[in-house]
Every structure is written in structure tokens, then in C-alpha cells.
Amino acid sequence: MRYTLLIFVLSLCTAFTQEVVKEGLLDPITITATRFNELISDVPYSVDLIEGRDILEDMPRGFPSVFASNPGVQVQKTANGKGSPFIRGFTGFRNLLLIDGIRLNHAAFREGPNQYWGTVDPLIASRIELIKGQGSVLYGSDAIGGTVNVITKDSSPLSYEENRSFVEGQIMYRGSTAENSHTGRIEGLVGIGQKTGVLMGYTDRSIGNIRASGIGELPFTGYSEHGMDLRIDHYFQENVHGIFSFQKFEQNNLWRVHKTIYSKSWEGTSVGNELRRSGDQSRTLAYAQIKAEDLEGPFQRIHANLSWHNHEESRLRIKANQKTDFQGFDLDSFGSWIQMESDTALGKITYGTSYYQDRADTFRSDLDKDGNVIRKRIQGPFGDDSTYEQLGFFVQDIIELNDRFDLNIGSRFTHIDANIGRYENPQTGLQDQLNNDWDNLSNSLRGIYKKNDKLNIYAGLSQGFRAPNFSDLSRLDSARSNEIETPSPDLNPEKFLSYEIGSSFDDEKLEFGISAFYTDIRDMIVRTPTGRLIEDEYEVIKKNGSEGYIYGLELNTSYHINDRLNVFGALAFNDGMVDTYPDSSLLVRSEPVSRLLPVTTNLGFRYDLSDSQWVELSSIISDRQDTLNTRDRSDTQRIPPGGTPGYAIFNFRYGLQLNEQTLLTASIENITDQEYRVHGSGQNEPGINFIFGASLKF
């Protein structure tokens, strides 16, 4: 607890300041909170907005890193390229990721931190919205800790005069020393003003082995990734907008090093025994959307979507005894939704329906040391020849009770069908199949009181649920250190109820935001040891019935001392207990929630040297996390004995806007070359890191 006093003292020093959502933006807008454009100050949620300009200045090395300085978010990395944000105590499939309102979550998402958020290129985003604790009313299953919506760049034909042709481009670069990384992106923009625009982009990123302070180079932490994207915007009329988009992103040679003999012990962590565990993954998304606004009749606005999403993953593992296996999956997700909005005497009503169907094939082959197939298994990481369908109907009404108080009421009905065509029965070792379905009704009630133009107070409660997916029902693959998870076909949905109260204040100089939350957990699905040993790993299965809670506090502050100097700070912590099965006796024990966010503080200032130059000094201060449950303590490859040490990281950035077309940035991250690891991660973070970025428009 050595950093606790420092954290709270520094936090009190900035107790009347709040970090600006976007510098210079007077009325930031959110789409995700209510499914239509709304001022952030008018929604009864905790909303974090990351603008494209922020991404361009920071040039993060991957999508999860975008959230590294976000209060209340802990970006765990099982391995380099495999970041998984924890939002209000939840990660993986208990957070929902959207791209332009389309679910990236699919039925193959596995328990705990996973690598799937790494398939999003942050450089395609015009902004990223994070709604914390939103619940399941608007978007369905999974949105427990938070909902993230990546709003992609459009081709902006409305920014140009009618019938005027335009051609533009942009080149971006980022290089760093401690990762030996290089990122390049090129964009091209063509179109006809007020009618049609086409935006094309390509990103290539090469990441070398990390150089960590104290323990040196981390072998096999390097990887490569690249992506392409296309977006076409066409205005049929001034109020009717059509969109077609295509995105493809690939990651290659991602090692899970902590499982192998090449990992390095730190603060007493154990070293894996596998000779290799590496994989590739790719994601493809194509969609068409139509938006119509200012309509006459019962609907004033309509937004509809058709999408196809493909995700492929493969993994090669060589065990200590030379036994080798190659496995993976190929999943197609077909999605459609439509939402309508009506301005009525009963309020602004949003209602609609959504349907997603996931189809997946999986494989696993056992190989000899020469790479020859000696056995083909019944399934891959989860059941083969599987389908998963989600049908939902939702309604939301925002009622303006008076000039100061708005009430937000919502409800959603969801029906889910799961069909596992083939899976390996853990008891018999023979092929089996399963069919299951579930219904859920989730509700939300929230209100916001606007004291005046500067101050508001909001409160509410939101129900959420997460239905069992392919991975829950039929997984046959590694879990944590020295564990293997086997199929668990008899599961039911998890249920959550989140309570939240918060407030924000905003005037010309001071901004302040605070939110407190409490999430009640019912029937959560948890891994449970059986006592069996399978292929040198301890078997775990999944069970419903875990009950518990998570609560926390988030504080953001910022103060403009003058036109050039802004100081900012943030404070966040989580705590909670949940029922667990620590051993094969099946006796229930209440233990701390796994991988809890330690008390974390962000502090810094930004000074504009001139209209074209700025400097920023920031810090991330994290307390020691020694509140562990049984499975945390047994995860010895990732969590040191007794817990993860605290740390204080300081970063410096400089920016120079040479002209309207050219931006140059230079940064020093981890100035003091601190040895540190984000709690629950499988590797240490880079030591002192020199970063150079450039953007040129033409």
C-alpha cells in the first residue's frame, strides 16, 4: 500500500478540477448513450469521449492502449498485442464493443481477458465513445462494465461545395524505441461535394520485442499487423444518407509468452514450460446503412443496418514433451437492425429490433514433431458446426418532465438460440451435441436534473445480462496458468443490476465529474476446479450460481488556469466480492473479484507554448494490488506472489503544428524507466520509450 497516501494527497490537490473531454469542444455529442445524437451534458450516464485529434496526437500502438489513461479502465495485456480493458471490474465478453453501432462481440468470445479488441485499428476512428455501466436495454447481451462504440471516419462530402470535386490525402507515422515499432498509415479521399465521398486507408504496423526495465528484452513479444478500410458516403437527399463500409485487419505471430520457456520471471512469477504458443487472427467487416432524418409522419428519424462480420483465428502450441497441436475457428456473423425515433407528447421515443446470427466452424489437429497430422479432434477451441442467434426488441422513452428534469425509461426483450453441432463430451470423450435457448427482459430507469447550464446531477439503475456463448458451453482449451477448460452445456444467463449516481460541472475554467456505482451480480458463470488432470493441466468447468457485487468511484477534474495552461487529474478504484469455487470440493466461498483495479490516479498539465506548440506532462500512479482471490494467487505466471507491485509512471509529450497540413509530435514515456506490470498481465510494460509521430495532409 506504499502509494496510497501519495495518491490521495495528490488527488486532493486537484479535487476541484476535471479533465476536458475534448479541448476546445463546447458541446460534445454522444450517439451511443441513447442511440441518437445527444449532448453529453444531457445524458444520465458516465460518458468518456476520445476524439480523433486525441488519437492523432497520442498515436497509440494498438486499440486497447487508447484507454490506458482513462479513469476507471485498466488495460490488461496477457501478451503484447492482446490487450483487454477492464471497465468497472469487467473485461472480455462482459464489455460490449461496437463499430458504427454494429456488434464486434460474437459467440466465440472467451472468458476473461482476450485478444479480440486488438483487431480494431484506432486510426480509422473519428471518435471513440465509452458509456460505463449502460446495461443491456439498447444493445443487448454483454454490455455490463461498459459499451464502447468506434465511430469511423466518414468521407465528409457535406464539407465541400455542391458539385465540386475534391481529392485529398494524409500520411501518418509513429516510431518508438522501447518497442522497436513502426506504424504507417496512408489515406485517400475523393468525391463530389454535397453528394458522394470515398475514403480509403491502409495501416501497417511492425512491433519488435519489448525492452522492459530491469529484465531487458522480452523474447517473442514482437508481432506484425495490417489493415485496410473503405467507406463510401452518398447523400440521396439532404436528409437521406447512405453508407457502405469495408474493413479488414490482420494480426500475425502473436505469442502468449508467459506460457512458454521464454518468459522472464519478475517479482517471483513462475515461467511457463511450453516451447511455443503463437497465433494469428483476422477480422473482416462489411456493412450498409441508411439514415433518414427530418421525416414527416410517425417517424422523424430512421436508421437501418445490414452487416457481415468474419473472424478467423489459429493457434500453434508445442508442449514441453514435444506434443504439438494446431487449432482455430472461422466465424461468420450476419447482423441487421433498424431503429426509429418519434417526437411525441409522451417524450422522444426510440424503438427498434436487431438480429444477429453467428455461424462457426472449428478445428484441431494433433501433430508429430515433423508437423504431420496424427489425429483430428472432434472440435477446436469450442464446439464445431455451431450457430448462435440473437433476436431483440427495444424501446426507450426520454420524457422531459420540466425544464430541468428528464426521465429516461427503457426496456428490451431478447431471445437467444444456441446450437453446438459437435463437441467432445468431457465424461465419455465421444462426440455430442446440444441445443439451448433463453429469454431475457432487461429494463432501465434513469434521470438527470439540470440545476443550470453548468451543473447537472444524474442517477439511475440498469439491468444487464450475458447469455452463455459457444465458449461457455463447449470450450476445450487452456484457461489460466496450468488449467484446461472443458465443455459445460448446462448453463443459464448471468444477470446484473447496476446502480449509479453522478454529477458534472462545466464552466469556462472549471470542469468536474464524479460518479459512484454499485453492480449486483446474480448467476454469474465462473470456472470451477474438478480435481481431474487432463494432458498435464488441471480441469476447470463452468457453473452458474455465483453471486456478489462490485462497487467503485470515478473522479475527473480539469482547471484552465489561463488561456494556455490546463491542469487535470483523475482518481478511480473498484472493490467487490463474488462467490467462487476455490477447489474441487464444490464448497462456495465469498472472495474478492478477480483482477480488481487498484487505486489509480492520473495527474498532469498541458501548456500551450504558442498557437502551434504545446507540451504535456502526465502521470499514472497505481497502488499495489494485493487483494487477490484463490485463482489470482494460483495464476503465478501473471501475478507475483502477494500481489502486483504499485508504480508511478511519468510521460512527456511535445506537439508542433507546423501548418494546417503538418503535425509533429515527440514523446518520452516512462521517463524514470520504472519496472512495472499492469495487474493481471502476462508481461511487463516497456521501459523508457522515445516516440516520434508525424501527420502530413496533402
Language-model-detected regions and their locations in the chain:
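Flexible loop and strand-edge segments within Gram-negative outer membrane beta-barrel domains
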Residues: 219-221, 239-299, 310-331
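Outer-membrane beta-barrel translocator/receptor signature
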Residues: 110-111, 124-126, 132, 137-215, ...
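Surface-exposed extracellular loop regions of Gram-negative outer-membrane beta-barrel proteins
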Residues: 250-252, 259-265, 312, 359-361, ...
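Signature of Gram-negative outer-membrane beta-barrel scaffolds
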Residues: 350-452, 477-480, 583-588
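Outer membrane beta-barrel strand-and-loop segments of large Gram-negative receptors
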Residues: 329-339, 390-392, 486-492, 498, ...
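Acidic, small-polar-rich N-terminal luminal/periplasmic segments of exported/outer-membrane proteins
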Residues: 24-160, 501, 679-680
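Gram-negative outer-membrane beta-barrel transporters
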Residues: 400-407, 415-416, 517-520, 541-631, ...
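Outer-membrane beta-barrel "beta-signal"
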Residues: 446-448, 502-504, 686-698
